[in-house]
A protein has these predicted regions:
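Extended, well-folded catalytic/binding cores that form a central cleft or groove in large enzyme
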Residues: 1-592
């Protein structure tokens, strides 16, 4: 699938927005959008379209905007409407010669409630245009698309706000408009089913989406995050996953301590924060090779590259022909870039190693791996008790409690009450609000009869007794001994009659297991099995895997690992509402 098409469509939309007004203009962004939209349009592109200033949208108005045209680009959020109103009122109060013009674009869709709010605030009439910036998916890499809806899971489970399901459905319609109709759709979980039902309803209203002939995508698997909560809480042990958990990767960029790098390394260095910024994506050859490896395999790759560069440097140049010398000189910038890349990733690997070789990290990892193996899940865990006694960061304690709860299909009521008492005593009464959120989200609960995780661990081989990290034969390598259930579902589906067999195995998990076939208007699709179809062609099948509620880099690495196995003959396009890790996922539930 050519992800470039998606980027080009978003750029066309953006050009229309920027050309809505003549001359110099300022953009005031919803802060959550600046980074993702930067993946679609670089700064030079904005300059070409006469954008002279960019500001984040904040409660206190900007005072120094000296251009005539002000464009607001925002998510449909009522609080942000108050910020827009404050900015417009502040501008209108100034004594100036020329009036300013205001334009508002909602990403991805307008909202009736937001427009109403602007009327109440008395600024609706001041806006020359209220439009839409239709960009549902942001392209993070050539196989990875994210909607960047950071609170989707929380909105669904805590706030009962299902607007992200409608947005997901719109994104899937947009995908089919670009790449053609997806003939086969499979899914697991209530919200996965809801997203698909809304998508079908929208397709019926929109003939352009429905009449498409089958495109380049063969099928789609929609996975509701609530089906597999263990994988989102587990520590990722891949190179990219660890960088994300320790330093945070946002819109493919990571900020690292500047003093560890040469001044020439990285995109930029911020003197105030003393951070150097790096872009991490598959355009950099070495990172593409490292990103999906277990961290214990990273050293081997780095040392191989170092030897290769050294041997190139030691080649004798005296007996080369002029033609060979010319070739050598032309290749010098490429060699220099390789050396730079090797130096950067060797330093990043050292930074990561310092963290993961600490006792704190290893002790916590040991505790979570015991839970993955279902050992001692029915009684208070002594490591968790020690963490509480030491007043360790609340998030670390809650994560392990939630993992114990998932492994035991709930905590025994006595154990749950005991943990609650201990937490309140040490961290204060407000932790009860957080615990309430975790209970609503399905992360913490009292035990019921059925041991779901325990059974699935056996039937789907979710854990390995001995880790295979350097030359893995199974997806367990991404967490050392644990295979993400979400990806195991995809892997099982690739087998003959895989979905039928899965339907039975997954019956104990919440929500329906469904399959659907979209025939084109002119031709009904044969319900043939996926595998019989695959054998007729050597072209890899393209499968979209869509996570409703977020997915981790470890899950992405596991899917890439599956696509590299020759027997599977598939290519995955991974779509998600948000890229998450154990920290960012839990933070949405913690009440400060």
């Amino acid at each position: 699938v050519n992800v470039q098409l998606l980027q080009e469509a978003a750029v066309r939309e953006f050009v229309d927005i920027l050309d809505c007004c003549e001359g110099a203009k300022a953009i005031i962004w919803d802060e959550s959008l600046g980074g993702p939209v930067g993946l679609v349009a670089r700064y030079t592109f904005l300059k070409e379209h006469h954008v002279t200033k960019m500001y984040p949208l904040r409660p206190e108005p900007w005072t120094e905007i000296d251009v005539k045209n002000i464009i607001f680009i925002t998510r449909p959020n009522q609080l942000l409407m108050d910020y827009i109103a404050a900015n417009i009122h502040a501008e209108e109060k100034k004594k100036k010669v020329s009036r300013k013009e205001y334009f508002l674009y909602f990403l991805p869709k307008k909202s009736f409630l937001c427009e109403k709010r602007l009327q109440v605030k008395g600024v609706h009439g001041s806006l020359s245009v209220i439009g839409e910036f239709r960009c549902d998916f942001f392209p993070f890499d050539n196989d990875l698309l994210s909607m960047e809806l950071k609170d989707a899971y929380k909105e669904l489970y805590i706030e009962g706000d299902t607007s992200c399901l409608h947005q997901s459905a719109c994104a899937l319609i947009g995908l089919q408009k670009l790449y053609g109709r997806i003939p086969k759709v499979y899914g697991k979980g209530s919200y996965a089913q809801r997203v698909w039902d809304i998508t079908k309803a929208l397709a019926e209203e929109d003939s352009e989406a429905l009449n498409n002939d089958k495109g380049v995508i063969d099928q789609m698997i929609i996975i509701d995050r609530s089906v597999d909560l263990m994988s989102v809480l587990a520590t990722q042990l891949t190179y990219e996953g660890l960088i994300d958990e320790i330093y945070g990767i946002n819109n493919t960029t990571v900020n690292l301590p500047a003093e560890k790098f040469n001044t020439s390394e990285g995109l930029s260095t911020d003197r105030n924060t003393e951070k150097s910024q790096f872009i991490l994506n598959s355009k950099e050859q070495l990172f593409a090779e490292l990103r999906d490896k277990n961290f214990n395999a990273v050293g081997v790759v780095l040392s191989r590259h170092a030897k290769s560069i050294k041997s190139r440097a030691n080649e004798k140049h005296s007996d080369m022909s002029i033609q060979e010398l010319k070739k050598l000189v032309e290749g010098l910038p490429h060699i220099k870039a390789k050396e730079q890349s090797l130096s950067t990733h060797t330093t990043i690997a050292e930074l990561v190693k310092n963290v993961i070789s600490s006792d704190d990290f290893l002790d916590e990892l040991g505790c979570e791996q015991e839970f993955m193996m279902c050992s001692d899940v029915d009684k208070p865990n002594s490591f968790i008790e020690d963490l509480i006694a030491k007043e360790a960061p609340l998030r670390s304690v809650l994560r392990l409690m939630c993992m114990q709860s998932i492994a035991g299909s709930g905590l025994k009521p006595k154990v749950l009450d005991y943990y609650k008492r201990e937490l309140v005593q040490v961290y204060g009464l407000q932790t009860l609000l957080t615990i309430g959120n975790l209970e609503k989200a399905g992360l913490l609960r009292a035990q019921t009869g059925q041991r779901t995780y325990h059974v699935l661990r056996k039937t789907l081989n979710l854990t390995a007794e001995t880790p295979e990290e350097v030359s893995p034969k199974d997806i367990t390598y991404v967490h050392s001994i644990y295979a993400p259930l979400s990806v195991r579902i995809v892997e099982q589906h690739l087998k003959p009659n895989g979905w039928q067999m899965l339907t039975e195995k997954l019956s104990s998990l919440p929500g329906p297991t469904f399959e659907d076939f979209q025939s084109s208007a002119s031709l009904s699709t044969r319900r043939g099995s996926f595998t019989s179809e695959i054998s007729q062609s050597d072209i890899p099948r393209v499968i979209v895997v869509f996570f409703v509620g977020g997915c981790t880099f470890a899950e992405i690495s596991a899917l890439r690992f599956l696509s590299q196995q020759e027997d599977n003959n598939v290519e995955f396009v991974i779509c998600t509402t948000k890229l998450v890790n154990k920290n960012t996922f839990l933070d949405t539930f913690i009440e400060n």
